[in-house]
């Protein structure tokens, strides 16, 4: 009798599992059909278009709400325009709460659900779009298997460390090609605001410069840019920030010292664009009686960069060991979000300008390019290098009207030029333009709004 009871119990458990699988498959079918019904999508184009016929796994990493899904929707629109049927599009967003309990074993149900919907369509003719798939543990094993066995048209997006280039190179074993996504560029910002950026009349130029001033202090997150009400924009930004704080940091890494983490983030925000000593911040936090270890702060700094809240660059040096020992400079993912978290300060204009320049460089530098900063007797904000070759030196300043500032910026970039043997020098300002010739070298000075278009 005991054996019979055990057997019956196993049968009941198996029945429940099968019912759960059937229910999950039905949900997957519903999600697939819902996304197909939305095609074509009503979206505003971005500067960088994803390839439609790439024989690799296209990965789209980026911070939350920066437009990763929109880029995939634009690809789908292009595919449909090229004659691909809607039924050949398989889109799944794994941030749907009904999929939160999915495991890597359940991912095969995605293929089963699609096959049951369209048994006549070969998987090799399907274009698969997996949004936020990194929420499923070991997702990469499924993606690589599908790519090698069934389909070579796969697009995946995500907003945490698992979508970083270093992770992708290892995880996808050379099958992936990366297209990082950021909040809107200045050109995209103008497009979203219906502001012309080419063939400008005098009135257009005035409007463009005003748009730049707004862009430098406001948010570049797409949804926020399109929102007209200031109060709603602020609520959206607070919501984005809290999602990063709690979902990407506190929950993911089991951080219990939330108040200390908030303070640490604000310290990095305040020290924007300057070399930052984690050790100095640690001593400050400890002096206030807050309990945290130095190792915690170093880990938190890593986590903040992994979730794309911050971007950090190292000091230029030819020694990899020295590079790791030097202080990093931290930049924030969005000026408007920083303004929403901190009280805006009038002297922040230069910081915000340099922050936007760094973001623009990240959008436009090649995969093999590296961005560092120069610090010797004097300083230069950005050194753009590829392997051992220094491509460009960039200095950023709000204005060069002041004689002391002018000399500091020029002398800093000249010292960097001598140290790196690079004569391609650029100074980016708020609204000044000229060409400086000194020491038989030429330094171009250009307004940020013009440089970014």
Named regions from a protein language model:
Residues 71:
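Hydrophobic positions on the alpha1 helix immediately C-terminal to the Walker A/P-loop
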Residues 92-123:
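Short glycine-rich substrate-engagement loop in P-loop NTPases that contacts/grips substrate
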Residues 14, 88, 230-390:
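Accessory nucleic acid-recognition modules appended to NTPase machines
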